[in-house]
Amino acid sequence: MTNESSKIFDFFPQGLICLDLETTGLSPLLNRIVEIAGIKITPEGIEKFSSLVNPGITMDARNIAIHKISNEMVKDSPPLSEVLPKFMEFAGNLPLLAHNAQFDLGFIIYGLHQLKLPFPHNKVFCTVKLSRLVFKEFAHFKLGILAEKLKIQVKNAHRAEDDAMVCLEVLKQGLLRASEKDLSGSFLFHLDDFHIIDNFELKDHLKLLQEKIDSQGIMRIKYLGGSRKNEPRPIRPLSLLPLPQGNVLYAHCLDSNLYKMYNLNKITECIPATEEDLEKYKKIEEK
């Protein structure tokens, strides 16, 4: 066993699961899983889980270009109702880790609710958060960039099993530098924090969010939170995510040029972007 691998058991004595998903889009509340993979590392050794998933819809060319999973590849694959229970059995109660875990676990959480499956007490950790804490010399923390910086071999980027393995390698190197405080800083939630949340319907006045997430377009929202209560603010919506405190919009705020979370219950209106908003985004992209 390498020093990197043995370090895992200092922090996770029972072992852990590194997982990754490929999906039809960025929003767990709107899109679907097309591949699930997990790497289980325990004191007994390493096990792998990997399965394509038939999403029940036709994927567009933009999705396929990212993960290279075609409609032909998934047409005879099992549906999520068959794959997710098997994956959860594989995972057991071990801690779950993923790169940008809120995204991947958002899809898992939504699937558990839709299929009325039990919510185990797994701890969930994010290797993006851990990387920000321990690789302070890096400016960017996308999985591919970390793999390059840390000299991790990547066979098939944007395929679930390979990305899960890269996530594991990032974790191994991160734990060589990490303290218990760093690990605490990468903790997100327990999976069963979500067991009583089941309202995933998007209200009518928020439907423009779905359109703009799909097109990666610009729009405005009126929001009851923050210092500019109910004033229109330009955003680029990226994803809708379930959280224990309620569903949120993850978006790029153009005024601050920061990525923020917005509680869906506090968004009072969705408005088309102005020409000024589009010009502002163009200038941000050009920097």
Spans of features found by a protein language model:
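Conserved non-catalytic scaffold segment of RNase H-like nuclease domains
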Residues: 1-110, 114-115, 119-121, 145-157
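Acidic, Mg2+-coordinating catalytic module of metal-dependent nucleases/exonucleases
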Residues: 95-103, 107, 111-112, 142-198
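Core beta-strand-centered patch of the WYL/Sm-like small regulatory domain
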Residues: 200-287
